[in-house]
Amino acid sequence: MYSQRFGTVQREVKGPTPKVVIVRSKPPKGQGAEHHLERIRRSHQKHNAILASIKSSERDRLKAEWDQHNDCKILDSLVRARIKDAVQGFIINIEERRNKLRELLALEENEYFTEMQLKKETIEEKKDRMREKTKLLKEKNEKERQDFVAEKLDQQFRERCEELRVELLSIHQKKVCEERKAQIAFNEELSRQKLVEEQMFSKLWEEDRLAKEKREAQEARRQKELMENTRLGLNAQITSIKAQRQATQLLKEEEARLVESNNAQIKHENEQDMLKKQKAKQETRTILQKALQERIEHIQQEYRDEQDLNMKLVQRALQDLQEEADKKKQKREDMIREQKIYHKYLAQRREEEKAQEKEFDRILEEDKAKKLAEKDKELRLEKEARRQLVDEVMCTRKLQVQEKLQREAKEQEERAMEQKHINESLKELNCEEKENFARRQRLAQEYRKQLQMQIAYQQQSQEAEKEEKRREFEAGVAANKMCLDKVQEVLSTHQVLPQNIHPMRKACPSKLPP
């Protein structure tokens, strides 16, 4: 249990001096089964707590989903009720407005009938009013026709004017040429910048490589110095160990000589008293031999400890040297791998740039082909629209001629009817009584005056039509002049639409000419 908590612990602990070693006591043995059961019980408690937490969270989630579902249903029903109320209110409002409108129309109709009954126009006033209304309608129709023709002419001028199209095409071609030149210059500038960047990266890579070589040389010198210092330290330790060993040997020899001299002296002193002191000599010899044996064992133990320490130091030094060599080899392999990755990255970058150039050229070619196709399509559409416009103009002109012929035939029919009415009136006048001759003569004179006024009105209408045709001709001349002026104005104020801007101008607007 102790080793599981704190890891493997060495029992031997070095003291303040080289020959002092403290042995750590063994940790007490724990109750393995009880700890295992306790661990299983804790794991079951954690598992049950996790299951309870999962069930609680699932219950909370279901409750939240149910509350959200109920809220959505309540909101849906509330919205449906409000929409239904709004629709009903709208329908009721529409019905009320319809009823008010019906009442208003009925009221206006009643007022109109009342006014007509109160007014009781005569036939002559009604004819004058109808003539005035006809004149106003003719003027209104003529004005609408002129506005429509002007609008169509302006639209035809803006969309299908050949001179304007040629001028705009020339301007567009010039701009395309200028933008292509600017694009070529921009690509050359990009290539130059890429070349400068590659040179800079090569220079930085060379500097980095030289710095790495310098660091490796310094590291090698440092490792060499460290190995030399380690070797000198090991030699010094071996020398000190040999000196200690020689001192120990000399001490053993000195002790042996001392023991021998003591034994000889004791033997010489106790030769006569051997029988009396034999027991004491035997005890003294035993004590001395035991002390000598303990001293020899202690010296041998110290020698073995020193040998083990020296072997550990040598192994540690060799291990450090091996680790340094492995690190150096790993660094060299990392540097070679980084060089390979960098070269691979440069090759991939060149391939990507070539692919981008090819893709860019392909996009330009597709854009050019698309623009040519669009221009051809526009030309075809313009020709078709021009033909349709000519057909429409011819149809309109034909309809105008037919309307004019119908109008003239109707006028002739009206004149014939009027002449017929005149003849009938004259016959009626001849059939009337003599006493009403003066009155009939006066009425005939008034009617003759009205006919003269109608003839004068018709002559004025014909002169007005001639004047209108002359004005139309002058308006056509002025429109032609305005067309030419408008062409110059459009050319002077022409701007490229946003959808026709070149992609390079959108990408780099500050590096291209305006």
UniProtKB/Swiss-Prot annotation:
Subcellular location: Cytoplasm, Cytoskeleton, Cilium axoneme; Cytoplasm, Cytoskeleton, Flagellum axoneme; Cytoplasm, Cytoskeleton, Microtubule organizing center, Centrosome, Centriole; Cytoplasm, Cytoskeleton, Microtubule organizing center, Centrosome, Centriolar satellite
Keywords: Cell projection, Ciliopathy, Cilium, Cilium biogenesis/degradation, Coiled coil, Cytoplasm, Cytoskeleton, Developmental protein, Differentiation, Disease variant, Flagellum, Heterotaxy, Spermatogenesis
Keyword DNA damage carried by entry: no
Biological processes annotated in GO: cilium assembly; cilium movement; determination of left/right symmetry; epithelial cilium movement involved in determination of left/right asymmetry; flagellated sperm motility; manchette assembly; sperm flagellum assembly
Annotated tissue distribution: Expressed in skin fibroblasts (at protein level). Expressed in nasal respiratory epithelial cells (at protein level). Expressed in airway epithelial cells.
Gene Ontology cellular component annotations, sorted alphabetically: axonemal A tubule inner sheath; axonemal microtubule; axoneme; centriolar satellite; centriole; ciliary transition zone; cilium; extracellular region
Main location: cytoplasm
Coiled coil regions in record: 91-148, 203-474
Result of changing residue 158 to G: In HTX6; uncertain significance
Record InterPro entries: CFAP53/TCHP, TPH_dom
Function summary: Microtubule inner protein (MIP) part of the dynein-decorated doublet microtubules (DMTs) in cilia axoneme, which is required for motile cilia beating. Regulates motility patterns of both 9+0 and 9+2 motile cilia through differential localization and recruitment of axonemal dynein components. Required for centriolar satellite integrity and non-motile cilium assembly. Required for motile cilium formation. Through its role in the beating of primary cilia, involved in the establishment of organ laterality during embryogenesis.
Quaternary structure annotation from Swiss-Prot or TrEMBL: Microtubule inner protein component of sperm flagellar doublet microtubules. Interacts with PIERCE1 and PIERCE2; the interactions link outer dynein arms docking complex (ODA-DC) to the internal microtubule inner proteins (MIP) in cilium axoneme. Interacts with CCDC38. Interacts with CCDC42 and IFT88. Interacts with centriolar satellite proteins PIBF1/CEP90 and PCM1. Interacts with dyneins DNAIC1, DNAIC2 AND DNAH11 and with ODA-DC component ODAD4/TTC25.
Disease: Heterotaxy, visceral, 6, autosomal: A form of visceral heterotaxy, a complex disorder due to disruption of the normal left-right asymmetry of the thoracoabdominal organs. Visceral heterotaxy or situs ambiguus results in randomization of the placement of visceral organs, including the heart, lungs, liver, spleen, and stomach. The organs are oriented randomly with respect to the left-right axis and with respect to one another. It can be associated with a variety of congenital defects including cardiac malformations.
Family to which this protein belongs: Belongs to the CFAP53 family.
The name this protein goes by in its record: Cilia- and flagella-associated protein 53
Organism expressing this protein natively: Homo sapiens
